[in-house]
Amino acid sequence: MGYKDLKFDKDSVFLVTGGAGFIGSNLCEAILNLGYKVRCLDDLSTGNPKHVEMFEGNPNYTFIKGDIKDLDTCMKACEGVDYVLNQAAWGSVPRSIEMPIFYAQNNIVGTLNMMEAARQNGVKKFVYASSSSVYGDHPGLPKKEGIEGHVLSPYALTKKTDEEFGRLYKTLYGLDTYGMRYFNVFGRRQNPEGMYAAVIPKFLKLLLKDEAPTING
């Protein structure tokens, strides 16, 4: 089953946070291609406005520049929304080790703000970005939900905390939450540059230049 087989009410409204990012912009594009309304919320701190400029002029698309750390912004963005796809977060394990407080503010408080705004606005489903990093130091393969070790970075801890809040919001308030544990996602509009770039685009960039990638381990 592909995304084109998904069916929602014809007037459904989706809010994509971090919508100008790599994953978020692809979600915006897919939903617009299905004919549904999309609101893109992004503060453009890491998102690229060029990723979403192609949607300008589409009557089903609205861009909101705002920060999920601000609850009022989240509340307004969720008004009249049916589905939230929360992708807004700061990535990179190494950078989180350098900036643990900043990561907690963005990835935990920001996601909690979005869950609360979704709850108060009667959102039907709340899907958020978690990470494979929540499996921590558990050596078992393949990875399985419910079998996790100790997390190894502030970034992983923010995602594990998000999952706990997601579980509580479902149990206590009935918000239908789903966390997606991404494993090295790659695709269009991903940035292969910089010291914090993901491993797959880094490898591809080197291979395209006929250079050997370094594999640790």
Which positions does each model-derived feature cover?
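N-terminal Rossmann-like NAD(P)+-binding domain of SDR-like oxidoreductases, especially those catalyzing
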Residues: 1-185
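Residue-level signature of the cytosolic catalytic core of signaling kinases
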Residues: 57, 192-196
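A conserved pocket-lining segment of Rossmann-fold NAD(P)-dependent short-chain dehydrogenase/reductase
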Residues: 96, 146-148, 175-177, 181-191, ...
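Short, polar/charged, Gly/Pro-enriched helix-capping and turn/loop motifs at alpha-helix termini
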Residues: 110, 141, 192, 213-214
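Short, charged/polar low-complexity linear motifs in solvent-exposed/disordered segments
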Residues: 153-154, 196, 210-211
